[in-house]
């Protein structure tokens, strides 16, 4: 983990622990580069396929005290109550925001979606 990633989570130890667990699962897919920005951490293979942030994608009263938002880029929309928000950012590219409150949410369904996003990011245009 880079110093920039650690700095992103400064003062947020619960979110850092969740990010570490998430990143471990994602890196099992293959080569991943994490690039920390001011408002998000982009996860890339050939292209950005996912981002991690603490954006408020739901009203504050509906969000847990500690959470991460995992944003996935996919070719098709997902239909699940776990998706907090989704939009077709451009034709054939759907952006999905998923609120994660704990490592127990890193389940088979989520890992399948991450795998789809990883493959989508790694495709040839």
Each predicted region: which residue ranges?
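Generic, low-specificity signal for short hydrophobic/alpha-helical stretches with a mild N-terminal bias
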Residues: 1-4, 8, 25, 34, ...
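Charge-rich, low-complexity N-terminal segments
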Residues: 1-24, 29-36, 40-41
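Short linear sequence motifs
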Residues: 1-2, 12, 87, 111-113
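Short, Lys/Arg-enriched charge-dense amphipathic segments
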Residues: 16, 54-69, 105-111, 121-125
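Amphipathic alpha-helical interface surfaces
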Residues: 18, 22, 48, 110-113
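Residue-level marker of positions within ordered structural domains that often coincide
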Residues: 31, 75, 122
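Short, conserved beta-strand/beta-arch hydrophobic-aromatic motifs that form part
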Residues: 36-95
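Well-ordered alpha/beta subsegment
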Residues: 89-125
């Amino acid at each position: 983990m880079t110093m920039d990633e650690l700095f992103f989570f400064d003062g947020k130890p619960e979110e850092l622990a969740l990010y570490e667990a998430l990143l471990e699962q994602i890196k099992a897919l293959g080569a991943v580069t994490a690039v920390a920005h001011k408002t998000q951490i982009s996860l890339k293979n050939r292209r950005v396929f996912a981002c991690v942030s603490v954006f408020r994608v739901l009203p504050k009263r509906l969000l847990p005290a500690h959470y991460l938002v995992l944003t996935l880029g996919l070719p098709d929309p997902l239909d699940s109550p776990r998706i907090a928000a989704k939009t077709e950012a451009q034709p054939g590219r759907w952006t999905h925001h998923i609120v994660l409150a704990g490592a127990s949410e890193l389940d088979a369904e989520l890992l399948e979606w991450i795998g789809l996003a990883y493959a989508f990011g790694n495709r040839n245009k």
